[in-house]
């Protein structure tokens, strides 16, 4: 893998890293809210690159080494994060890319496919949602966690790590694949390279989100693969089923014994599925 690099994309500085050979089909990995590039683990990226893909991961604004903003005052909206993805393709001189988005990143990927279809070779949507009042609600446990007004002391790295670990445990929905002892060092490493922990954990939830993408799903014209945990407590399976119905020719793969996370145990399904889906340029 290449060293991390600060790139000028969509008018801001974003930190990105690449794996594999530039001549191979490009995959841009777009993660969810409050997550830096490290949420796409090194081994996951390496497995995709070993399948002859040029893999790009990056830090969203307010995560990792990318541009930061004051806590509670993000100087951007959801649309800006979507344009950041296209800006990274520009910065890397990539005319097109296969977009792989997880959670919020899936929404950004769908938005990019709608607004910049000529730049998007395909979509892979992991644990994401198109939004809509008719879709199943979050689990009571997750909703209680995210609406709890009590916040940890973000200046205390241990307290921040405890908070994130609790959130991920709830997202895992009791999956036997969740290992808190292995997860905690990954969280600590991610937080250690974050400019402002409070901003990273608050600002993506404070930004303006814009209009729901649901009414426009039928306009998506790029090949679309949907990978979704059967036990997802954040976006229950009905969210994925709605996308599979409403995005033309979309294909849904349900991940057994899986919640909102993408644990290593399901990579044996996820990685080959992505490689097969992105075999064209």
Tell me what each language-model feature is:
Residues 12-68:
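Conserved HGGG/HGGXW glycine-rich cap/lid loop of the alpha/beta-hydrolase fold
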Residues 220, 226-228:
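Short beta-strand/loop motif that positions the catalytic acidic residue
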Residues 106-117, 123:
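Short glycine-enriched nucleophile-adjacent loop
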Residues 63-100:
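Active-site loop/oxyanion-hole signature of alpha/beta-hydrolase fold enzymes
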Residues 121-155:
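Flexible "cap/lid" loop of the alpha/beta hydrolase fold
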Residues 250-281:
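Catalytic active-site module of serine/aspartate enzymes centered on a nucleophile-bearing elbow/loop
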Residues 158-200:
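Conserved alpha/beta-hydrolase catalytic His-Asp/Glu region
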């Amino acid at each position: 893998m290449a060293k991390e690099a600060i790139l000028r994309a969509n008018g801001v500085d974003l930190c990105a890293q690449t794996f594999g050979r530039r001549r191979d089909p490009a995959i841009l990995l777009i993660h969810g809210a409050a997550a830096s590039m490290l949420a796409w683990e090194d081994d996951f990226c390496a497995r995709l690159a070993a399948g002859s893909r040029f893999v790009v991961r990056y830090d969203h604004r307010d995560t990792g080494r990318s541009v930061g903003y004051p806590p509670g005052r993000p100087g951007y909206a959801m649309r800006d994060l979507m344009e950041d993805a296209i800006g990274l393709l520009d910065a890397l001189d990539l005319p097109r890319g296969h977009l792989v988005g997880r959670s919020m990143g899936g929404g950004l990927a769908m938005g990019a496919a709608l607004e910049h279809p000529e730049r998007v070779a395909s979509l892979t949507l992991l644990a994401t949602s198109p939004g809509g009042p008719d879709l199943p609600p979050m689990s009571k446990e997750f909703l209680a966690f995210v609406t709890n007004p009590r916040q940890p002391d973000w200046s205390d790295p241990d307290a921040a790590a405890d908070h994130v670990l609790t959130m991920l445990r709830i997202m895992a929905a009791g999956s036997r694949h969740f290992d808190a002892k292995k997860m905690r060092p990954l969280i600590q490493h991610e937080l250690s390279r974050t400019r402002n922990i409070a901003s990273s954990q608050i600002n993506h939830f404070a930004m303006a989100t814009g209009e729901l993408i649901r009414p426009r799903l039928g306009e998506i014209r790029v090949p679309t693969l949907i990978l979704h945990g059967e036990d997802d407590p954040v976006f229950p399976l009905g969210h994925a089923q709605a996308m599979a119905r409403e995005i033309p020719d979309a294909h849904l793969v349900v991940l057994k014994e899986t919640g909102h996370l993408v644990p290593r145990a399901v990579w044996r399904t996820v990685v080959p599925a992505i490689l097969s889906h992105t075999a064209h340029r």
